[in-house]
From Swiss-Prot:
Its main location: cytoplasm. This is Ribosomal RNA large subunit methyltransferase E. The active site is at residue 180. It is found in: Cytoplasm. S-adenosyl-L-methionine binds at residues 82, 84, 100, 116, 140.
Length: 230
């Protein structure tokens, strides 16, 4: 794998690969496979040793917002398959703990927990494991999509709210939170509690996020445990 300054792929795409439709392959599956084969980020992730193209999203967000500092403690919610955990380790975090309901293959240097981050004792458990509270809580989680935009939007907002309230318990003063949301209007309901507890709140859509996708990332920095009183 290349070093911490790995950059996303640039330049024109290569030859477009088209797949013949197999009898047992659905149209949606056919479309997904064709897109994967022609996605430069998928190819670059494989070539550079990242477990998913999503690694480039965190690389871009970190380059822009300075989320991962040397020696920091990082929690990766919904860590599978481990791409964001890899990036955090490669960029100098001292302690990285990934949590997911699914099993995740080991990432050198990181601790991976198969469990539910929403368990009441999880923030305290992770704080004890890391030797202190986190400097960054990050989430690239998304619920299973239904194809109905409004439903999918509300589902990810609810999931991100859970991640945000986890971060309130898990973050050290001055810490940061980054999470994926889908655009659709209701993401604004996240802003008020975030503005109460963080010094700055921004939205960003990395270049590696597919143009047709409604996903964007909310980035909050300067955590204030006591809200505006701090």
């Amino acid at each position: 794998m290349s070093g911490g300054k790995t950059q996303p792929p640039t330049g024109p795409r290569g030859k477009v690969v088209m797949l013949k439709t197999a009898r047992k392959r659905s149209v949606a599956s056919q479309r997904w496979l064709t897109r994967q084969l022609n996605d430069p980020y998928v190819a670059a992730a494989k070539a550079q040793g990242w477990r998913s193209r999503a690694a480039f999203k965190l690389i871009e967000l970190d380059d822009k917002f300075g989320l991962i500092s040397k020696g920091s403690r990082v929690i990766d919610l919904g860590a599978a398959p481990g791409g964001w955990t890899q990036v955090a380790m490669k960029r100098g975090a001292a302690v990285v703990v990934g949590v997911d309901l699914l099993p995740v293959d080991p990432v050198p240097g990181a601790t991976l927990i198969q469990g539910d981050f929403n368990d009441d004792d999880m923030p305290a458990r992770l704080s004890s494991l890391m030797g202190g509270k986190a400097d960054l809580v990050m989430s690239d989680m998304a619920p299973n999509t239904t194809g109905h935009a409004a439903t999918d939007h509300m589902r990810i907002i609810a999931l991100t709210e859970l991640a945000l309230h986890f971060a309130f318990d898990a973050l050290a003063p001055g810490g940061a939170f980054v999470a994926k949301v889908f655009q659709g209007g209701s993401e604004k309901q996240l802003l008020e509690p975030m503005k109460q507890r963080f010094a700055s709140v921004r939205h960003a859509k990395p270049a590696s996020s597919r143009k047709e996708s409604s996903e964007l990332y909310v980035v909050a920095k300067g955590f204030r445990p006591n809200g505006l009183q701090d």
